[in-house]
Design a protein with these regions (language model features):
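Bacterial N-terminal signal peptides
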Residues: 10-20
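Bacterial N-terminal signal peptides that target proteins for export
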Residues: 2-11
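Conserved functional micro-motifs across diverse proteins
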Residues: 25-193, 197-215
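Conserved, well-structured beta-alpha core segment at the onset of a catalytic domain
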Residues: 2-3, 19-26
Length: 215
């Protein structure tokens, strides 16, 4: 085999592997029953090993970081961020609940299949946006859309923002959060994206979201 042919072959293999990696880490819109039960196990096992309230806290913090986009609350507590409650996120949460209830009742507890199927069939992804502002009601009436290149995707529903809580760290005086729903069929689960929040005072807040790194 010539050097040129070897180079072409290697490039082809790298391209295939890269494409496979991207697809594996994109937001999963469709899950098989096997995938769903693996997600339950992924959530269940760390909680089974958690033997103290501090261990449980660490498990829950790690779970929220896995699908969080935008600012890292550990290093930037008042930076805007969003937790993407994907299908895998919800199933892993079910798994943690299974482990917690099993310990509490001292018997094995498992989620009914109809609950699991309901998550698998969910048409929308819920996100929870967390941000800071200058007064208690700064997030009231906030609007949000998802931008992917030139495409603009509107939220199909936006929850009422929480009344701001006093911010004990540096930055704006209050922190708040709200939820929004986006239809899976309307966005690309692999694309680099930005959630754009528009507040009633005219301020725009952008939360970058690399979907290819979220399950």
């Amino acid at each position: 085999m010539t050097c040129r042919k070897q180079t072409i072959l290697m490039c082809g293999l790298i391209g295939i592997l890269s494409a496979g990696t991207s697809a594996a880490w994109a937001i999963d819109v469709k899950l098989s029953s096997e995938d769903a039960h693996k997600a339950l196990e992924t959530g269940r096992l760390p909680m089974e090993k958690a033997n103290s309230p501090e261990d449980v806290k660490k498990v829950l913090q790690q779970a929220s970081l896995a699908t969080r986009v935008g600012a890292d609350p550990e290093t930037d507590p008042c930076g805007a961020s969003a937790v993407l409650r994907t299908k895998r996120y919800r199933l892993e949460a079910f798994g943690r609940q299974e482990a917690a209830e099993s310990k509490k009742r001292n018997t094995e507890i498992r989620m009914p299949e109809e609950f699991i199927k309901k998550v698998m069939d969910m048409p929308n992804m819920e996100i929870e946006v967390q941000l800071c502002g200058d007064d208690e009601y700064f997030a009231e009436g906030a609007l949000i859309e998802l931008q992917q290149g030139s495409k603009r995707i509107k939220a199909i529903d936006i929850g009422k923002a929480e009344r701001g809580r006093k911010n004990e760290t540096n930055g704006p005086a209050y922190r708040s959060r709200f939820t929004a729903l986006f239809a899976y069929e309307q966005f690309d689960p692999n694309a680099a994206s930005v959630f754009v929040v528009n507040l009633q005072d005219g301020k725009e807040i952008r939360v970058p979201a690399e979907f290819s790194k979220v399950k």
